[in-house]
Amino acid sequence: MNTRIEHDTMGEIAVPAEHHWGAQTQRSLENFKIGGQRQPQEIITAFAYLKEACAQANADCGKLTAEQAGAIAAVCAEIRAGRWNDEFPLVVWQTGSGTQTNMNVNEVIAHLAADRGMRLHPNDHVNASQSSNDTFPSALHIAAALSVTEQVLPAAERLAGAFRRLEEAYPDLIRIGRTHLQDATPLKFAQEVSGWRELVEAPCRMLRTALPELTKLAIGGTAVGTGLNAPKGYDEMVCGRLRAMTGVDFTPDANKFHALTSKDALVFAHGALKALAANLMKIANDIRFEASGPRCGMGELNIPENEPGSSIMPGKVNPTQCEAVTMAAVQVMGNDAAIGFAASQGNFQLNVFLPVSAYNFLLSARLLGDVCDSFRVHCVQGITPNVERMTANLHNSLMLVTCLTPRIGYEAAAACAKKALHDGTTLKEAVLALGYLTGPRRYGRRKWYKRRVSRRGRKDSLPVGYSAFPGRLPDRGDAPPREKRRRARCFPCCWLCWRRRRTGKGF
């Protein structure tokens, strides 16, 4: 391998000739051979935005020439375009302030500018008015805000739109509800889907609430928050340039001491990501359980068959998209624990868990953005209800007895449900057997009872063709009260007359 000699304050070191990084990047490569997780590309892109904005602000303050600032800006634009991704090889597991990554960006910009005829020093020019202690926290917030606005929110809103279309496609389909994994009262399928939609939309509102804190930047605080070596008004200039480049309302944090030592804004924002992950897991579980089967499960939903599900069981198809969603959700929840603990370690004037916080936050954002789109395209858009199975389960449910509770009371309704379950009959048969509901009305009974119920104001609360009474009745319990017999013209004057008319026999 061809090398060239670079130097820093610790001396000379050999660097691969084909790469544009310098001595400090090379030392980090040799000293931190830990894991394989490189700094997220989102962090490098955020640094490219930040370095360009800082260069332009330094030019406005007279600390750089317009030509120097222009050279830095040109290289930063190429970095954001992804042209030099191979020049940023450092892993997450390095110094907790991210100093090596900051210097990696500085060195690459300086060397690429030198290739274009502009000699720049990584520290004196590219890092002017800056410290790793304020640039890495700022780059972290820039990357986090952009990942939320460009990845998570658009993907989640597309998923919510898919649920809305599913909701509108089946407005009148009734299904049985379930609580505690047991049968419950009925609801519309569209109502259940509206709940899924809101489970996606609510965390989006939480994320928008968290964004204003994420857009506050530590830039201008330099080493410990005092702003040493940074011109007055420099932080406002940098944020103004960033707003123009990204369209995001970045502002300087009013208290730089807080900005350098605390990552509470990151914890708050990731809490909203965790809420989205938890809700996605709930939705995915609902869908895969309701699609279980095809013959021995619930089978109330049909989901797309995307790939074979088993290497040994022919014809088996699994809810793979739902499983991918649940695994991504588990990872996000683990990331949340890491971010929370890292944020608690801001000892004195600087939090030194910045790279791991950045890695976990950006991984969560990337996972959620990708999984929302994958789940929408390969599962949600292809969901159809199994109307036949839904209807059969609806009519077979014992919890329909809840509708009778206002009429016959809670205990009587419970007795009906238990009898139907014990005897293996339908709920209707159990209610009839216990006498809480009569069969179809005959002769004058229908007309008399219709008037009686109408006077009580309860006509519309009964099923068509049936009448209910508050308690178990004797065999003659449907006879009208004595004082009302004369009004009921179609009802016989006594039980014996009723028997004679019914059977045609004498006494």
Provide a role label for each language-model segment.
Residues 500-506:
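Short, intrinsically disordered C-terminal tails of secreted or membrane-associated proteins
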Residues 459, 484-485:
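Polybasic, lysine-rich low-complexity intrinsically disordered segments
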Residues 448, 495-498:
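Tryptophan (W) side chains
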